[in-house]
């Protein structure tokens, strides 16, 4: 289990001095190429996610050090009712080298850019880890009546780089969103990660991955296997779209059973 930096927001200020880094609009091809060159990035920062969020206006922007592209962001703009003012939102981003980039340069440049686009405020979701808990520790905490929330457990690991980012964001005037039940106004603050590699980087086989799960998870996976549940990859967009209705039907039944509001089929067609 990992805790990430909370979604943070800022009322867009008027810049007092030019930022060394420059932010400007880029095309989707440049955006995708930059993401492909990185070790990892959230799908919420891909141009395709902007097309999914059709009710928001989308923009791909790049962070430039001179003419060198050092980071990108998908910015979503949501207009306030009856006025031409927008909230800018960067889900799971921006995509930067958070441990290396000068945030005092990059973030004011981003704020200035969205302000010029009519935004009154901006919300970002720094993809940095601040703390980790082991699966066993979480399991023990669930069984302990004195543990009411994950924060009551001392983490097995604290990430100094993530903590440094959080501190710098506060110093720059960014404010964390209040999380309720592990969720803030944006993406989950706490995420469970299943390791697929050992500490030394060796890939784990299926048995080793299952061993890291609790008994209930292992039982459910074995039950699905016995019932003939199969996972298949679609060959191309047309085949995927043809199977989408079957998925959506199952999804709607799940929503009815678990009492949550399902997305329409159109939401999954990008």
Identify the role of each PLM range.
Residues 1-12:
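Short, intrinsically disordered terminal tails adjacent to the first/last structured region
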Residues 13-14, 79:
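Short boundary motifs at domain starts and secondary-structure transition points
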Residues 15-17, 89:
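Short glycine-enriched loop/turn motifs at secondary-structure junctions
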Residues 20-83, 128-131, 157, 161-162, ...:
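A conserved beta-strand-loop-helix scaffold within acyl/acetyltransferase catalytic domains
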Residues 51-152:
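Conserved donor-binding loop and adjoining core beta-sheet/short helix segment
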Residues 101-110, 158-169:
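Well-ordered, non-membrane alpha-helical segments in soluble/globular domains
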Residues 112-120, 164-176:
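Structural alpha-beta junctions
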